[in-house]
Every structure is written in C-alpha cells, then in structure tokens.
C-alpha cells in the first residue's frame, strides 16, 4: 500500500514496506531515484537499528548475540499507519517474531513524514 502526502503541486509517496520514501515530486519533476534492479532497486530505506553491516555479521548487546542483515530490520518489515492527514503521515513498527530473529529486543519505531511547500521532513 502506498500513502501520498501533498502540499500544493508537490507530493511525496511512501510505502508501508519499511516506511520507505518512494517518490518526491515537485511541480511535476521527480527528484528521487526510482530504482533499477540492474544497479539498485531500492530507494530511501529506513535503517534501524544499524546503518551498514555488522563486523562478521554479528553483534552482542546486553548479553544477547544476534546476526543482522545490512541496514537492520526496519526496512524489510512492514509498518502500520499511526496517523495521517493531507500533508503528513506517521508510521509505526513494533518488534515482532520476524524482527526478533535478527534483533532480539522489544521496540516501537515511529517515523513521521511531513511535506510543507517544497520541503519534506522526517522525524
């Protein structure tokens, strides 16, 4: 499912999969890489709880060892819409059975995207 937020002639499109920004359009011009599987099919992933890769693919925290894919668990797991209006959307992801396979901790991750004029912010 895709969510579109707008401000005048400008808009952003975001997906529930990883709360990823899929499109950033200002006055009819697309400003975000649209993906090409020949090079890189992704766009603007949310990296949580890490960015990049772990040394040897492993980490230990609070006595728990885990292995984690590049850029963490958020980008490969779905989010839900927590709040939405014309120019903003807040996504939420809670730890679950899938995320705990790689990141064995409870969490709640909220990400809010807002478009105002020609500016998109995320918190």
Please place each PLM-identified region on the residue numbering.
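Surface-exposed acidic/polar loop and edge beta-strand patches at domain peripheries
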Residues: 1-121
């Amino acid at each position: 499912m895709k969510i579109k937020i707008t401000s005048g002639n400008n808009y952003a499109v975001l997906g529930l999969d990883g709360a990823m920004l899929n499109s950033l359009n200002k006055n009819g011009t697309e400003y975000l890489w649209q993906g090409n599987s020949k090079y890189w099919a992704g766009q603007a992933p949310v990296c949580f709880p890490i960015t990049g890769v772990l040394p040897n693919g492993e980490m230990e925290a609070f006595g728990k060892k885990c292995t984690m894919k590049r850029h963490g668990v958020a980008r490969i797991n779905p989010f839900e819409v927590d709040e939405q209006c014309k120019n903003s959307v807040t996504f939420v992801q809670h730890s679950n059975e899938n995320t705990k396979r790689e990141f064995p901790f409870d969490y709640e991750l909220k990400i809010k995207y807002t478009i105002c004029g020609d500016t998109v912010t995320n918190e």
